[in-house]
Design a protein with these regions (language model features):
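Surface-exposed loop-to-helix/strand elements on domain peripheries
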Residues: 104-117, 145-152
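Compact, glycine/acidic-enriched structural inserts
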Residues: 111, 118-133, 137
Length: 207
């Protein structure tokens, strides 16, 4: 395992359609666009785009995923990491200010609070996508689709191990409570298998 690193990502492009979808708006959301724009304008300057991450060895055997520092038990994750000898483990957050805005408008403007929820969800997903793309480009590798605790049969308790090895509170101010909820709430932890060079060459030939 190499050392744990912290990276601040340049603000990803904002996808209005995705934010509206996360906010629960249907296809006919024309009347919500103005509220979305105003909400994003207020939230935008308060957001951060921080990631802490490390590369770990991975050995899979049935539902056991052995990362050296800890083990996770999931057939779905094991299948996802099949063919990889190393894995990128990361935690990402857009910061606590979006939570504060949501709480404030939850009291005075519920519709704006819902829109801010959608913006926060879009922003953290965009951050994860941007980070993974940047990692691939900087390291000349390909990553498998990211896989997070709580998805499929991967226990949410796996969060504890990720937080321990990445030192999330120290590095990016991300904490985990006894109910396994993250704070700030617009945060993600995930595994992304690093495709071995031989497999990458095969994929490139297929393309």
């Amino acid at each position: 395992m190499s050392g744990i690193r912290v990276k601040i990502i340049e603000k990803p492009l904002f996808n209005e359609r995705e934010a509206l979808r996360y906010a629960g708006c249907g296809n006919d959301a024309g009347d919500m666009i103005e509220l979305l724009k105003k909400s994003f304008e207020e939230a935008d300057k308060k957001l951060v785009y921080k990631v802490c991450f490390g590369e770990f060895p991975i050995n899979t055997d049935g539902d056991v995923c052995d990362f050296g520092s800890f083990k996770a038990y999931s057939k779905n994750l094991s299948r996802n990491l099949s063919g990889c000898s190393s894995v990128l483990i990361f935690a990402a957050t857009v910061g606590v200010e979006i939570d504060r805005l949501i709480a404030r408008y939850g009291r005075i403007s519920p519709s704006k609070a819902v829109m801010l929820q959608g913006i926060g969800a879009e922003r953290i997903e965009a951050l994860c996508d941007a980070f993974c793309k940047e990692y691939e480009e900087e390291n000349s590798v390909k990553l498998k689709p990211r896989f997070s605790p709580g998805y499929g049969d991967l226990p949410l308790e796996t969060q504890k191990d990720i937080f321990a090895v990445l030192e999330c509170p120290l590095r990016i101010g991300l904490s985990l409570n006894d109910s396994l909820l993250m704070s700030p709430s617009k945060s993600v932890t995930a595994f992304a298998g690093i495709i071995d060079s031989r497999e990458k060459q095969t994929i490139d030939k297929i393309r």
